Regions:
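C-terminal segment of N-terminal export signals and the immediately downstream linker at the start
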Residues: 1, 23-41, 48-50
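N-terminal export signals
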Residues: 6-28
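Extracytoplasmic "Venus flytrap"
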Residues: 37-56, 80-86, 109, 179-182, ...
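Beta-alpha junction/loop-to-helix N-cap segments that form part of ligand/metal-binding clefts
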Residues: 49-53, 70-140, 205-210, 236-238, ...
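Extracellular/periplasmic Venus flytrap/periplasmic-binding protein
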Residues: 91, 136-137, 144-248, 283-293
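Periplasmic-binding protein-like
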Residues: 101-109, 129-131, 173-176, 224-234, ...
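Extracellular/periplasmic periplasmic-binding protein-like sensory domains
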Residues: 243-313
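Segments of small-molecule ligand-sensing domains
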Residues: 300-310, 318-376
């Protein structure tokens, strides 16, 4: 098991040309950063996710570089903006993999973009470490070179369903992104079937804005569920909850982690009361965990906003760095193998595990609830 002190101190070496003198090797290594590529939504309606993931990964690499980098070599993040658009992600990945200096990929965002990136990464034989999505494809064979650093949506949905089934509730509703219906509705139906619940109503919303909100609200009024699960981003969700949450204070409403929670709470204010959230990293107030403590300190130093998404990016960056340190060389194949050699990384709140046969690093899920002052309990 790799713990904090050992993690920060490690610096596995890459093989270098034997024809170079030690001094020349040191100079060459110091002069050339190891580059990892990112495609994420850095502008547009989903920019909150992309910038937070980028900033979290950057904070992790800052820490790694401060402690000697990888064999004395700094690690550099090259981020490209895809605006949350699948076609732009594909174009960005093509640019990144065409650059021989890009050794691995990291920090992708949204389901369509993460899926596109994962499939292309597998085809190109390059590691993709961490994506801000729990969509099933990332955990399957089509994403054979993707190493996930968050629990899947299946794990999050199951945690919510099991919690409310224990409380005796069985009738569930689902607000989902319209373009993800074919993936996420059957997934929830499967989870409910094995836990003795029923999906009684579904309502789609638009990933890019509030255009479908009125129809979703009307649909839910026809057959109110006992529990409402929501898997949507901020663009539709803020307006939806501003109208729906005050009407349904008693009804549990649980939002899956694919959301900029802090912005949502700030935008909703008192209207957030009673809205619950599933999270795939610990609350950033829990500084008893070394990884949280270290991130919060670095974030203050770097001026990085502290959110669950930026903390997830930080954890992703640490996992990536550990894979780089385990690689026998800087080749893309060696880095994939290096990720498979990470073993158990002790983050305090959970052990992230990667092996040759295990690419799902974390299964951690927790639940929280917004109070009347938009805080969390």
């Amino acid at each position: 098991m790799i713990q904090r002190r050992r993690f920060l101190a490690r610096g596995a070496g890459f093989g270098l040309a034997a024809t170079l003198s030690p001094a020349a090797i040191r100079h060459a290594v110091a002069a050339m950063p190891l580059v990892v590529g990112q495609s994420a939504a850095l502008t547009g309606p989903q920019a909150g996710f992309g910038t937070a993931m980028r900033d979290g990964v950057q904070a992790a690499l800052h820490s790694v570089n401060r402690h000697g980098g990888v064999n004395g070599r700094p690690v550099q993040l090259l981020s490209l903006d895809d605006q949350g658009d699948k076609a732009k992600t594909a174009a960005n990945v093509s640019l990144l993999v065409a650059n021989p200096r890009v050794a691995a990929l990291t920090g992708f965002t949204t389901r369509p973009c993460s899926e596109a990136g994962a499939v292309m990464a597998a085809e190109e034989g390059i590691a993709l470490v961490g994506a801000f999505s729990g969509t099933p494809l990332l955990y399957g064979d089509k994403a054979a070179t993707t190493f996930t650093t968050r629990a899947s949506y299946e794990r999050e949905l199951e945690a919510i369903v099991q919690h409310y089934r224990l409380l005796g509730l069985s009738r569930f509703g689902f607000v989902h992104l319209e373009d993800a219906r074919s993936t996420n509705v059957p997934l929830l139906e499967k989870i409910l079937a094995r836990n003795g619940g029923q999906l009684t109503i579904t309502a789609p919303v638009d990933r890019k804005g509030s255009g479908l909100n009125a129809a979703a609200l009307r649909t839910l009024e026809t057959n109110p569920p006992e529990v409402l699960i929501i898997l949507a981003n901020n663009a539709p969700l803020t307006g939806f909850l501003r109208e729906y949450a005050p009407r349904t204070l008693v009804m549990p409403k649980m939002v899956i982690s694919f959301v900029d929670r802090e912005k949502l709470l700030a935008d909703l204010g008192h209207d957030a009361a009673g809205v619950g959230f599933s999270v795939v990293v610990p609350e950033y107030t829990r500084e008893k965990y070394w990884v949280v403590r270290e991130f919060v300190a670095l974030a203050r130093e770097l001026g990085t906003p502290v959110t669950p998404v930026s903390l997830e990016g930080f954890i992703t960056g640490l996992a990536l760095a550990e894979g780089l340190k385990n690689a026998r060389s800087e080749s893309r194949t060696a880095i994939i193998e290096g990720m498979g050699k990470v073993g158990s990384l002790d983050l305090g709140y959970t052990n992230m595990r990667f092996s040759r046969n295990e690419r799902t690093g974390s299964r951690f899920v927790d639940l929280s609830l917004a109070s009347r002052n938009a805080g969390l309990v």
